[in-house]
Swiss-Prot record:
Protein name, per record: Ribonuclease P protein component
UniProt enzyme class: hydrolase
tRNA processing in keyword set: yes
Record-listed E.C. numbers: 3.1.26.5
Source organism of the structure: Pseudomonas fluorescens (strain Pf0-1)
UniProt keyword list: Endonuclease, Hydrolase, Nuclease, RNA-binding, tRNA processing
GO biological process: tRNA 5'-leader removal
Length: 133
């Protein structure tokens, strides 16, 4: 898998975000943030970011956080295949330094990867009502 962060690896529409918020199959709470994830049945993960002005006041800080989150996701996406992930920032996240944040995200990705979705296996059921029986 390539290490890019192309358009196909992003959650873009409100419908995509709503699907993750309404029925997350994975939740990883962290210090000053929350990771919500949902199975996506694709061969790649997708990322969405929610960083409001209420939780991180300065736009410079919000942009720094988004840049670090995208970079960390890009580097760990091989272990996150099959997830739609939304990161929700909480108060105080803007005060965390870059090295600490990078380390924190590494741990969060590992915790999420442990709950990796299992691909659906197609099986044929042969029953009494089937025409072959």
């Amino acid at each position: 898998m390539s290490q890019d962060f192309s358009r196909e690896k992003r959650l873009l529409t409100p419908r995509h975000f709503k699907a993750v918020f309404d029925s997350p199959t994975g939740k990883v709470p962290g210090k000053n943030l929350l990771l919500l994830a949902r199975n996506n049945d694709l061969d790649h993960p997708r990322l969405g970011l929610v960083i409001g002005k209420k939780s991180v006041k300065l736009s410079v800080e919000r942009n720094r956080l988004k840049r670090l989150m995208r970079e960390s996701f890009r580097l760990h996406q091989d272990s996150l295949v099959g997830w739609d992930i939304v990161i929700v920032a909480r108060k105080g996240l803007g005060d965390v330094e870059n090295p600490e944040l990078i380390q924190h995200f590494g741990k969060l990705w590992k915790r999420l990867a442990r709950n990796k979705p299992v691909p659906a296996v197609k099986t044929e059921t042969v029953g009494v009502d089937s025409p072959d029986a």
